[in-house]
From Swiss-Prot:
The modification N-acetylalanine is found at residue 2. Residues 62-73 are annotated as: Subunit association domain (SAD). Heterotrimeric transcription factor composed of three components, NF-YA, NF-YB and NF-YC. NF-YB and NF-YC must interact and dimerize for NF-YA association and DNA binding. Residues 140-163 have a biased composition (Polar residues). InterPro entries: CBFA_NFYB_domain (IPR003958), Histone-fold (IPR009072), Transc_fact_NFYB/HAP3 (IPR027113), Transcrpt_fac_NFYB/HAP3_CS (IPR003956). Belongs to the NFYB/HAP3 subunit family. This is Nuclear transcription factor Y subunit B-8. The gene is NFYB8. Component of the NF-Y/HAP transcription factor complex. The NF-Y complex stimulates the transcription of various genes by recognizing and binding to a CCAAT motif in promoters. SUPFAM superfamilies: Histone-fold. Keywords: Acetylation, Activator, DNA-binding, Nucleus, Transcription, Transcription regulation.
C-alpha cells in the first residue's frame, strides 16, 4: 500500500503515465492523497441499516478506490484543459472525461445534477446557458420529474431526508 501512495496520479498529466512526476507530487502524504476516512465512513453508513457495521479494511478500500477514481477522471479532464490551453477544470470537462473513460451510462443523471447545482449556485456560465438541448428557457430539464428531489437536497444531498438518486448499473435491469 505504501508503494502505491508514493506514485499518486493526483496532478497534471495522463493517468496512463502515472500522473504528475514533479518533485512536489513524489512526497504526497496519505491525508493529502485520500479523502478523509470519516467522510467515507459517513457516506457508506447512509446505505446501511441503523445497526449495520463496516469493517476498517472495507472503509480503507473504498477510501482508496474513491480517491483513485477522482484522480482518474480529473486527470483526463486536466489533459483536455491542457490541450485547450485552459487552467481551470469545470463540470463540463468532468462530464466529458466521464464519457471518454466509458462511464456513458452516468451521463444523463450527472448532467441533470450539474444543471441543478448551477441553478442553486446561480452559475450563469454553465452548460444550460451554453445551449444544452435538454435545457428549457427557464433552466428546467425535460427530465424534471425523475430528479425533482435534487433541487431540494443541495449540492451534496440532504442527509436528513435520506433520499438517494439511484443510477442503474450497466447490464442490470
Amino acid at each position: 500500500m505504501a508503494e502505491s501512495q508514493a506514485k499518486s496520479p493526483g496532478g497534471c498529466g495522463s493517468h496512463e503515465s502515472g500522473g504528475d512526476q514533479s518533485p512536489r507530487s513524489l512526497h504526497v502524504r496519505e491525508q493529502d492523497r485520500f479523502l478523509p476516512i470519516a467522510n467515507i465512513s459517513r457516506i457508506m453508513k447512509r446505505g446501511l441499516p441503523a445497526n449495520g457495521k463496516i469493517a476498517k479494511d472495507a472503509k480503507e478500500i473504498v477510501q482508496e478506490c474513491v480517491s483513485e477514481f477522482i484522480s482518474f477522471v480529473t486527470s483526463e479532464a486536466s489533459d483536455k484543459c491542457q490541450r485547450e490551453k485552459r487552467k481551470t477544470i469545470n463540470g463540463d470537462d468532468l462530464l466529458w472525461a466521464m464519457a471518454t473513460l466509458g462511464f456513458e451510462d452516468y451521463m444523463e443523471p450527472l448532467k441533470v445534477y450539474l444543471m441543478r447545482y448551477r441553478e442553486m449556485e446561480g452559475d450563469t456560465k454553465g452548460s444550460a446557458k451554453g445551449g444544452d438541448p435538454n435545457a428549457k428557457k427557464d433552466g428546467q430539464s425535460s427530465q424534471n420529474g425523475q430528479f425533482s428531489q435534487l433541487a431540494h437536497q443541495g449540492p451534496y444531498g440532504n442527509s436528513q431526508a435520506q433520499q438517494h438518486m439511484m443510477v442503474p448499473m450497466p447490464g442490470t435491469d
